[in-house]
Amino acid sequence: MKTDTSTFLAQQIVRLRRRDQIRRLMQRDKTPLAILLMAAVVGTLTGLVGVAFEKAVSWVQNMRIGALVQVADHAFLLWPLAFILSALLAMVGYFLVRKFAPEAGGSGIPEIEGALEELRPVRWWRVLPVKFIGGMGTLGAGMVLGREGPTVQIGGNLGRMVLDVFRMRSAEARHTLLATGAAAGLSAAFNAPLAGILFIIEEMRPQFRYNLISIKAVFTGVIMSSIVFRIFNGEAPIIEVGKLSDAPVNTLWLYLILGIIFGCVGPVFNSLVLRTQDMFQRFHGGEIKKWVLMGGAIGGLCGILGLIEPEAAGGGFNLIPIAAAGNFSVGLLLFIFITRVVTTLLCFSSGAPGGIFAPMLALGTLLGTAFGMAAAVLFPQYHLEAGTFAIAGMGALMAASVRAPLTGIVLVLEMTDNYQLILPMIITCLGATLLAQFLGGKPLYSTILARTLAKQDAEQAAKNQNAPAGENT
């Protein structure tokens, strides 16, 4: 009997020691294994939430379109209903952002960059529900926004949530898990794991603290996020444009010309985004009623636009393969391009919860295809395929605007599965980036972050000035 009791006690002691070792391992922030395990958790959660966000947005869009189909034969009902449904959905997103989490407005990527520098707060308990539900409203309304920015911000906030739940207190763990979540978010949005890694290294290079632990954590999170995405959505490329032909060496100079065009377009586009933001700020002046009504009007107009010209509304993923296939004339491509520039400015600059990656990719596709079709007419001896210029244009506008050419190249190649076009992509994106920099253009996300920080400092200074003298001493 004593022997059985002794054996039982020995087993209990061994179990307690193992639990204590695991607990101490998880509490030691400097332990790479603990951070890597947490990175795997962050990547898995980001993949699950990213897939759920995609499905939720699609569900809202299908419900809205289904309601319109029911009254398609009655024009006097169709047009008002299209406006009202999209307006109400958009107003939900604008209201939630303005009321509960202003940092959830817009793309969210500048907020993650600011958080990596410890300059912006990460209130995940507010941002996660607001960004998810608000994004369902604005994207479901058919507004010209993408889901990649929200997914990146959601991923970063999930990283901070995991950090808080497991009480990891070191600055290294806090920074690493935030970056891991952001990279996993981009991977989950585009099914582009390598682009997710490069996005953190390239776009967030001023903020990302590169070391062996942090980069391994980012790799781990992106792997888990991609696995989750592919379990639910399969392994097919997210944009189906088919296998395009190679670009002959004697045509590569045309891709440099295309890059020069985007090098001019990028800074102009960025400037228009910032000016439109200022215009909206002057209009609503921070008043929630004006802001929500303004958002409802923009959402309603996008709903109407979706009836008139479906290609001019929505994020643009459905438009890209249609445009790249050469189904539109050059004139129609340019018309849709201009229309989508206007709608992108209105939707994104108004502060709606939604990204600008997908709209920029669509804009690049439209202009690239138009250039390719024109070049095919001017140089028939080259037997050009307009789709190859569409692929190059997708990455070029992003390279010129965001100033992340490597991310743009890899992202487009992963999304379209046309890796044979890597050389023309490099030429186009490099030309666009160099000219945009030469013209004095600033990276879009960095500029938005700088404006946010300036506004934050001004608000803090005003609070300090208005505070009683006793509180400042």
UniProtKB/Swiss-Prot annotation:
**Where is motif Selectivity filter part_3 found?**
355-359
**Cytoplasmic compartment spans:** 1-32, 117-123, 167-176, 202-214, 282-287, 439-473
- Which key words tag this protein in UniProt? Antiport, Cell inner membrane, Cell membrane, Chloride, Ion transport, Membrane, Transmembrane, Transmembrane helix, Transport
Q: Membrane topology per the record?
A: Multi-pass membrane protein
Intramembrane annotation covers 109-116, 177-189, 193-201, 387-401, 402-404, 405-416, 417-421
Motif window: Selectivity filter part_2: 146-150
Q: Where in the cell is it found?
A: Cell inner membrane
Record: residues binding chloride:
S107, I356, F357, Y445
UniProt-annotated site: Mediates proton transfer from the outer aqueous phase to the interior of the protein, residues: E148
Q: Where is this motif: Selectivity filter part_1?
A: 106-110
Name a GO molecular-function annotation: voltage-gated chloride channel activity
Swiss-Prot/TrEMBL site (Mediates proton transfer from the protein to the inner aqueous phase) positions: E203
Residue ranges of the TM segments: 33-69, 77-100, 124-141, 148-166, 215-232, 253-281, 288-309, 330-349, 355-376, 422-438
- CDD domains according to UniProt: EriC (cd01031)
Which Gene Ontology CC terms are recorded?
plasma membrane
Which residue intervals are topologically Periplasmic? 70-76, 233-252, 310-329, 377-386
Q: Indicate yes or no for the key word Magnesium.
A: no
Q: What does this protein do?
A: Proton-coupled chloride transporter. Functions as antiport system and exchanges two chloride ions for 1 proton. Probably acts as an electrical shunt for an outwardly-directed proton pump that is linked to amino acid decarboxylation, as part of the extreme acid resistance (XAR) response.
User: Which NCBIfam families does the record associate with it?
Assistant: PRK05277.1 (NF003640)
The family assignment reads: Belongs to the chloride channel (TC 2.A.49) family. ClcA subfamily.
HAMAP family given in the database record: CLC_ClcA (MF_01128)
Supply the name of the protein: H(+)/Cl(-) exchange transporter ClcA
- Give the originating organism: Salmonella paratyphi B (strain ATCC BAA-1250 / SPB7)
